[in-house]
Regions:
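Interfacial loop-to-helix transition and helix-capping segments at the boundaries
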Residues: 47-59, 128-141, 181-213, 247-271, ...
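Alpha-helical transmembrane segments of multi-pass integral membrane proteins
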Residues: 212, 239-348
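Aromatic-anchored segments of alpha-helical transmembrane domains
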Residues: 17-24, 125-128, 170-185, 239-253, ...
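Short juxtamembrane and helix-loop transition motifs at transmembrane-helix boundaries
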Residues: 97-106, 123-131, 191-197, 221-230, ...
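Membrane-cytosol interface segments of multi-pass membrane proteins
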Residues: 1-176, 290, 294-297, 315-359
Length: 359
């Protein structure tokens, strides 16, 4: 069974749900006079806070799926330059569509902005600063990963490369990024460079590189299609294994996410595919697919709602599951509204053409 674009959308829908959990329930210091009620769980944490911490996996999931889609898209259509230009236009187009609506709303709500105003606005527009919403930080490293995709592809497709060798290189590279580079940058010779914005953005991109490369390798070896086929053949066994592995991932994630989320994400996806092959999974899959279609806009919008614009409204339901569903509904509705607003000019042009043709 082939891993399709629909499957990608469904997984993005899961990832955006994890992102909302992460931002809603992980940072009590960012809540101003509001809170949430959740049942106790493990290690002194509530279930909501545990799921919020696990929700950090969303970054690695989106990054891995980005690498997976990039490899397949470039393999099918060819032309790395065209691919890079097309994906950068898509990424920044989605960002700018929300940005030009968010800035005036933020100013009307008297949200603080950088000074001088125009300089700060230009930096924010280019994705070099995120005064209006820090959760937009993902724009820059993902753009850099897109630009660097040809190098990642050459690594994956190099002569005599084997799956085992590629994954060992990936694990070794991840160890260098997380354990060696920070020590090297502490050297007096490099201390000045280590404090620059350039290094900060570059290092953030490097920390996401293993997940992106993992996606490329999983696409090269068609591992997700193989996982989906296995789930179809051994449904009961895969379902039971997925439940156990997911429970283990949720439990250990607070202790290992920093350096190993590229592995956690690669393990999580086959588990999700196994659960989606059940009746309940098939029932909720269309909802997740719709969420996945709007996942980029929902990512850009939801943090504005829960941190900057209407926090008291978002946390009004009081109970964690209701808060999550409330923000999910509002974010999806706002994303659809953004899509509708930007479709109006095209609809008007189509209507004029139809009227002209009728005459």
């Amino acid at each position: 069974m082939e891993f399709t674009k629909r499957d990608t959308k469904i997984l993005k829908g899961i990832a955006i749900c994890l992102m909302l959990c992460h931002h809603l329930f992980t940072f009590p210091e960012r809540l101003d006079g509001v809170g949430f009620v959740s049942v106790p769980f493990i290690n002194g944490m509530s279930f909501a806070m545990c799921m919020g911490q696990f929700g950090k996996l969303c970054v690695a999931l989106f990054t891995l799926l980005g690498g997976y889609g990039a490899y397949l898209s470039c393999t099918r259509t060819g032309g790395e330059e065209r691919f890079t230009a097309r994906h950068l236009r898509s990424l920044y187009g989605a960002y700018w569509r929300v940005f030009v609506l968010a800035v005036p709303i933020s100013l009307l709500l008297r949200q603080a902005h950088g000074s001088p105003f125009m300089e700060d606005l230009i930096y924010c527009f280019l994705g070099l600063r995120f005064t209006y919403c820090n959760e937009w930080w993902f724009i820059t490293p993902f753009a850099l990963l897109t630009v660097g995709f040809p190098l990642v592809r050459r690594f994956a497709d190099r002569k005599n490369a084997s799956p085992e060798g590629n994954f060992l290189w990936l694990i070794g590279g991840n160890a260098v990024i997380y354990y060696v580079l920070p020590r090297v940058m502490e050297l007096p010779l490099l201390s000045a460079f280590a404090g620059t914005v350039f290094w900060t953005e570059l290092y953030t991109t490097l920390t996401l590189l293993p997940a992106y490369a993992m996606g490329v390798l999983m696409a090269k070896y068609d591992l997700l299609s193989a996982a989906k086929a296995l789930c179809a053949r051994r449904r009961s066994l895969c379902y039971a294994a997925a439940v156990v592995v997911l429970a283990a991932l949720i439990y250990i994630h607070p202790f290992n996410w920093l350096a190993y989320d590229f592995i956690n994400a690669a393990v999580f996806i086959p588990c999700a595919l196994a659960l989606l092959s059940t009746r309940l999974g098939a029932f909720i899959a269309p909802v997740l697919e719709r969420l996945g279609e709007e996942s980029t806009s929902m990512w850009l919008i939801h943090a504005l709602l829960c941190y900057h614009w209407c926090q008291k409204l978002i946390y009004a339901p009081k109970y964690a599951p209701l808060i999550f569903l409330w923000l999910l509904a509002l974010s999806y509705a706002a994303a659809r509204l953004v899509r509708l607003l930007y479709s109006i000019p095209a609809r008007l042009r189509a209507a004029r053409v139809k009227v002209s043709a009728a005459k």
